[in-house]
């Protein structure tokens, strides 16, 4: 599980810290690349500006954890671009958001999300949600990008 890179797209520093803490608490030791807005996520995935020097062009993460309400480029547009590009169209994308809006849920799946998880307010419940997410997407699930 350790060699699979996770791209966390999250603009809220508190939610970023909670997500990283929940991953660590569940012994998910994968490298996590953090993009703090939609434009950074697209730059990481498609290598357009070199903002992420640790990223080798053409290397696709095993999983994207995507918030919806992002600056510069919103999460749904990031998802649309992921699905529109041949290099990333099969990339697992889990929307991890605090949005309670039904239209976000429907539009997220309509744009090609693989999963939609509402962030629990309780940290213990959030840790458990991250544990289950990690178990499924990083251990049980197989993607075309394995070993990439």
Regions found by a protein language model. Give the residues of each.
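His-Asp phosphorelay/catalytic-motif detector in bacterial-type signaling
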Residues: 2-3, 28-29, 59-63, 87-92
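Acidic, metal-coordinating helix/loop segments flanking the phosphotransfer/catalytic sites
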Residues: 18-24, 33-63
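C-terminal output helix
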Residues: 40, 121-134, 142-147
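Active-site residues of response regulator receiver
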Residues: 67, 97
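Hydrophobic residue at a beta-alpha junction
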Residues: 70-73, 82
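Short, glycine/charged-rich "phosphate-handling" switch motifs in NTP-dependent
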Residues: 114
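Residues at the ends of beta-strands that form strand-to-helix hinge/output surfaces
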Residues: 117-118
């Amino acid at each position: 599980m350790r060699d699979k890179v996770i791209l966390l797209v999250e603009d809220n520093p508190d939610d970023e810290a909670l997500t990283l803490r929940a991953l660590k608490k569940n012994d998910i030791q994968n490298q996590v690349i953090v993009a703090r807005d939609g434009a950074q996520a697209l730059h990481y995935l498609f290598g357009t500006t070199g903002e992420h020097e640790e990223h080798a062009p053409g290397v696709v993460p095993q999983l994207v954890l995507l918030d919806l309400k992002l600056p510069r480029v919103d999460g749904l547009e990031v998802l649309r671009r992921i699905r529109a590009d041949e290099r990333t169209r099969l990339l697992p994308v889990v929307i991890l958001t605090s949005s309670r809006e039904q239209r976000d849920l429907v539009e997220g799946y309509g744009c090609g999300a693989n999963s939609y998880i509402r962030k629990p307010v309780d940290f213990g419940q959030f840790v458990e949600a991250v544990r289950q997410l990690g178990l499924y997407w990083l251990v049980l699930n197989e993607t075309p990008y394995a070993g990439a």
